């Protein structure tokens, strides 16, 4: 099992075409090939914050992913980012953990930006 930190994730992404991966994921989802259960959520009052747990897989793929993303809105008061997160990558056939991606919500930001670009392109046609 590998632990991959945000700085390494950024280097790896610079050599890939994440737009095509996200687009292919949308196509697989629209074709009914994705298993995406409802989002799990933990809410906190003091300090105010929440944690979302998302998970899923594409049928026939090699992996499934569990994403844990949190937002604690007073973190900036203590000098840390409001958003935290990681993704856990497992093999579909064995359940073995292949990698922990300590991305600090970076991959979520990239995915959101790319999804917006794809939608803008498709709706402008």
Give the residues covered by each predicted segment:
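N-terminal ligand-binding/catalytic initiation module
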Residues: 1-108, 115-117
